[in-house]
């Protein structure tokens, strides 16, 4: 389905977005759009909504779960505006968001789809679960001019790290991390 704007999607949401969870993909440029959408397709999302400029070309697909919305994702507050509008329209739905060339990983994602992860969360009475969004940078930009390498990916130079989260008194909280 192709929507000309966010209000058109919202108006149709009760009919077309009844199956969750829903992945929101902000497509800023042409880098790894196909692989990002394919990656999300392996997790059994009920719907995948790609937000992108009207002149952007998306991969041809027969997928009934992929929707396109024409939207300027580079505008100030684009992501919060989109997310808040959809949360208001579908308050009981679980949403995940990412940008193109970002890849979702969560515990046991190699063998469990996102619905199974959410079932686990519900059984455990959890409101959230630790997951990672990973940029897979290329070491050799001559060989990979788009900056992405699926085979020998590297983290960026500043790195990513986790520090123990502390309470107001400075005491480390069990099993809680601040990821930077």
Each model region followed by its residue ranges:
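N-proximal low-complexity "stem/linker" segments adjacent to membrane-targeting elements
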Residues: 1-34, 38-41
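Active-site-proximal specificity loops/subdomain of glycosyltransferases
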Residues: 3, 17, 51-98, 103-119
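Short loop->beta transition adjacent to catalytic acidic/histidine clusters or analogous donor-positioning motifs
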Residues: 19-22, 41-51, 66
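Short His-Asn-centered micro-motif
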Residues: 25-29, 51-53, 98-99, 131-132
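Short acidic, S/G/P-rich loop/turn micro-motifs used as interaction or catalytic elements
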Residues: 29-31, 102-107, 136
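Short acidic/polar active-site loop segments enriched in Thr and Asp
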Residues: 46-47, 93, 127
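Catalytic-site signature of metal-activated, phosphate-bearing donor transferases
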Residues: 108-180
């Amino acid at each position: 389905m192709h929507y000309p704007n966010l209000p058109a999607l919202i108006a149709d949401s009760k009919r077309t977005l009844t199956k969750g969870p829903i992945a929101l993909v902000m497509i800023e440029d042409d880098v790894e759009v196909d692989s990002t959408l394919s990656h999300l397709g392996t997790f059994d999302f009920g719907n995948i909504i790609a937000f992108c400029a009207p002149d952007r070309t998306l991969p041809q697909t027969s997928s009934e779960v992929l929707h396109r919305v024409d939207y300027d994702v580079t505008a100030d507050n684009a992501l919060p505006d989109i997310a808040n509008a959809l949360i208001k329209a579908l308050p009981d739905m679980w949403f995940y968001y990412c940008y193109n060339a970002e890849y979702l990983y969560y515990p046991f994602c190699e063998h469990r789809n996102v619905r199974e992860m959410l079932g686990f969360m519900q059984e455990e009475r959890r409101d959230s679960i630790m997951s990672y969004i990973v940029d897979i940078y290329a070491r050799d930009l001559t060989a990979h001019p788009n900056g992405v390498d699926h085979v020998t990916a590297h983290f960026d130079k500043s790195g990513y790290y986790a520090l123990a989260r502390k309470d107001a008194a400075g005491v480390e909280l069990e099993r809680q991390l601040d990821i930077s």
